[in-house]
Regions:
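Conserved hydrophobic/aromatic beta-strand scaffold that supports enzyme active sites
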Residues: 86, 122-124, 139-141, 171
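A short, glycine-/small-residue-rich helix N-cap motif at loop->alpha-helix starts
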Residues: 74-82
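Short acidic donor-binding/metal-coordinating loop in glycosyltransferase active sites
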Residues: 72, 100-102
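Short aromatic/hydrophobic "clamp" motif used to bind/position activated sugar donors
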Residues: 95-97
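N-terminal anchoring/stem segment of glycosyltransferases
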Residues: 1-72
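Conserved donor-nucleotide/metal-binding helix-loop-beta segment in metal-dependent transferases, i.e.
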Residues: 104-135
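Active-site acidic short loop of glycosyltransferases
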Residues: 91-93
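Catalytic core and acceptor-binding pocket of nucleotide-sugar-dependent glycosyltransferases
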Residues: 129-132, 141-216
């Protein structure tokens, strides 16, 4: 059952490292909008304690977000996986994974509500012609207790594969899709994969030149 009066049980999870304003300002904007668009949820930022500016951290905390500190340790692209660590948090019931540089919207919130009402374990969103991955790393979510030991899955995959910028996408395709493929709810505005996808409702829809997952 979705606990809409316990936002700490429902986490919007992000990774954040470095001082690139595309990500730091995006993080702050997401943290600002979340209490309005996602009042039943709490933002959580997994941050590199050595590279994210202190003023950004303080602002995120002041906006009501959770900040958890990690160290990058010069592991190429490993920070992309940090936001997935929420899946092993036993204090969390439900999570959605997002990108700092993609701003949350009413359109996606309505889709998330559809997923919750569907009773399915997982949620997948696609909203552009190039959204052709099985699972896009910043456009999915789920309930905890279904994926076993996510941290170990991540470490084993990371240590056994080529490190490049889509490593998180490949991990989801290779390791997570087989787990969720039989119990997910999908919103997709372009394709009807497996004949179970649902288009987005007209109410709350973004303008024609914008889409969920766009880099703002």
């Amino acid at each position: 059952k979705f606990k809409n009066n316990e936002p700490k049980k429902n986490i919007i999870s992000f990774s954040l490292w470095g001082d690139n304003e595309n990500y730091t300002k995006g993080a702050i904007l997401n943290a600002t909008l979340a209490p309005v668009i996602y009042p039943e949820w709490t933002c959580r930022f997994y941050c590199d304690k050595n590279s994210v500016p202190e003023e950004v951290i303080n602002k995120l905390i002041s906006l009501g977000s959770e900040v958890l500190f990690l160290e990058n340790n010069n592991l190429a692209y490993f920070g992309l996986f940090w936001r997935f660590f929420v899946i092993d948090d036993l204090n969390v019931d439900r999570y959605i994974i997002r990108d700092c540089d993609c701003i949350i919207t009413v359109q996606e919130k309505l889709a998330v509500d559809e997923w919750i009402n569907s009773g399915k374990n997982f949620h997948i969103m696609r909203d552009y012609a190039s959204h052709t991955e099985l699972i896009h790393a910043g456009l999915w979510g789920g309930i905890t207790g279904v994926i076993p030991d996510m941290t170990t899955l991540i470490i084993n995959y990371y240590n056994s594969t080529h490190k490049e910028r889509t490593i998180d996408q490949r991990f989801l395709r290779d390791c997570i899709w087989p787990i969720l493929k039989d119990c997910y709810y999908c919103n997709d505005s372009n394709y009807n994969f497996d004949n179970i996808s649902n288009n987005y409702k007209n109410l709350g829809r973004l303008p024609i030149n914008l889409n969920i997952g766009i880099n703002w």
